[in-house]
């Protein structure tokens, strides 16, 4: 069968190409064919052009860096055939990945419906990677139909709300076209976004692969499909029962729900088509846009890994290092969202979200250039999907402004270290903090026995906090906000919350 000459949809009309970097453009063509591409302005000025030879049914053009532009045309030719994409912009391009809180669409977020109806922003564009966990005919058709959209009245309802607020603020701040490549799936572990090479690079990743196989991950596809269909029958019935209970009994707690209808049957069965299998979605989603030229990666994930926090930072670091290889940029900025506060009604605080936040912070320190948007003052009690997505999106933009663009933007104060003075433990900070009258202190100190006690006396002096408790005569350890849910009271002068921390050495 002859190979059709065509561009992948990522470079269709309305696309945003990355400015000031070599731009990689690809598609399919017969082996040995010469393929030429160029980007031109509306008046015919050539901004960039390149030539390549197709191999293995694929061509990959390397177009020299371009400055910011709009209203351009991308023309790619192969012999007598031509592919033309119009309304091309040259600006900043970010991959937005993760799980459900990145996935939450603008139409379901606070302010979303009003913004969808009225907001017209010629600078903000987005491309939704089809959510497919199996590469089959349906996935091929979905990819062929995928396309870029611009934020305009009546559109953007299916755009990631976090990415929308990020892009809107960034576009307004730097006055540049912003392209968002949405690539996410709710309920996923970090391991879903790691390929086999990344998983096998660490002992932690290898354990996930072994556990997956032990749980029956290598079962025949048809068997998995039958189990999957049966699971969703059960899951949908459970959801229907819960919805009816909430309707009939407003304010009913989750323990009462579980006692009435039984615990939630989540997770779905493992198997070769499951979106939750390790190494799956990176193949069927992320790699469909590899090796695009990116400005950076936006990431909001971790809720599904709170039961396995001890290795999360290692896995997250391995994931990012592999993505930097795939996208051919060893210094690709990784901009992450730290988990907010959350607990389900009736649940005991097991501190697993607190441990996950600390793991995210450790990974952030190792993944430079990069940064972490702190959401310790955010979150909704008993709602794991808070509908305020402006705050995480705009704080993530502030991280980008500092890390990517070298601009002065608000940043949460951080703990830099600690030392002991007699019965006082002193924490040094990156910036002064203030204590608000509302909220909890959430500071604990411990001695060599490791038994933590609430701080009873705190003195804030410049960039130091002096902490004491009558229960700890010689404090050597300290932790802050080591809870899944709480109301913080320590903020920087810029209004941003102090980042959580733990010094236990």
Positions of predicted regions on the chain:
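Cell-envelope and extracellular/periplasmic
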Residues: 1-505
């Amino acid at each position: 069968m002859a190979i059709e000459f065509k561009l992948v949809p990522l470079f269709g009309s309305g696309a945003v190409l990355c400015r000031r970097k070599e731009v990689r453009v690809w598609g399919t063509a017969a082996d040995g064919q010469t393929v030429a591409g160029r980007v031109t302005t509306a008046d015919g000025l050539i901004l960039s052009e390149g030539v390549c030879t197709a191999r293995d049914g694929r061509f990959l053009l390397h177009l020299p860096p371009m400055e910011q532009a709009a209203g351009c045309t991308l023309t790619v030719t192969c012999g007598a055939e031509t592919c033309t994409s119009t309304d091309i912009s040259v600006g900043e391009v970010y991959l937005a990945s993760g799980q459900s809180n990145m996935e939450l669409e603008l139409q379901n977020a606070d302010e979303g419906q009003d913004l969808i109806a009225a907001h017209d922003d010629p600078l903000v564009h987005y491309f939704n990677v089809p959510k497919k966990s199996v590469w089959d005919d349906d996935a091929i058709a979905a990819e062929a139909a995928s396309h870029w959209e611009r934020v305009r009245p009546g559109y953007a309802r299916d755009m990631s709300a976090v990415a929308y607020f990020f892009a809107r603020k960034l576009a307004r701040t730097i006055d540049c076209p912003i392209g968002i490549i949405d690539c996410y799936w709710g309920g996923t572990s970090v391991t879903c976004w790691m390929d086999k090479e990344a998983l096998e690079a660490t002992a932690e990743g290898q354990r996930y692969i072994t556990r997956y196989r032990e749980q029956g991950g290598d079962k025949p596809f048809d068997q998995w499909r039958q189990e999957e269909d049966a699971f969703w029958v059960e899951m949908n019935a459970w959801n229907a029962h819960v919805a009816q209970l909430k309707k009939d009994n407003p304010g009913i707690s989750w323990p009462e729900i579980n006692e009435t209808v039984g615990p939630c049957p989540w997770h779905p069965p493992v198997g070769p088509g499951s979106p939750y299998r390790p190494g799956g979605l990176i193949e069927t989603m992320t790699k469909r846009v590899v090796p695009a030229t990116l400005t950076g990666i936006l990431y909001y994930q971790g809720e599904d890994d709170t039961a396995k926090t001890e290795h999360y930072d290692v896995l997250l670091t391995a994931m990012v290092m592999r993505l930097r290889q795939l996208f051919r940029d060893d210094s690709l900025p990784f901009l992450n969202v730290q988990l907010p506060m959350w607990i389900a009604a009736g649940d005991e605080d097991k501190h697993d979200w607190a441990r996950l936040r600390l793991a995210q912070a450790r990974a952030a320190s190792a993944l430079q250039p990069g940064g972490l948007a702190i959401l310790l003052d955010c979150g909704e009690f008993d709602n794991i999907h808070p509908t305020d997505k402006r705050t995480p999106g705009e704080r993530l933009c502030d991280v980008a402004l500092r890390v990517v663009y070298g601009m002065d933007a608000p940043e949460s104060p951080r703990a830099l270290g600690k030392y002991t003075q007699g019965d006082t433990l002193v924490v040094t900070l990156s910036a002064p903090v203030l204590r608000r009258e509302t909220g909890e202190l959430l500071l604990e100190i411990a001695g060599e026995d490791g038994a933590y006690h609430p701080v009873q006396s705190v003195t804030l002096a410049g960039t130091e906090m002096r902490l004491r408790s009558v229960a700890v005569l010689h404090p050597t350890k300290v932790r802050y906000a080591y809870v899944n849910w709480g109301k913080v009271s320590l903020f920087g002068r810029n209004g941003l919350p102090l980042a959580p921390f733990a010094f236990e050495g």
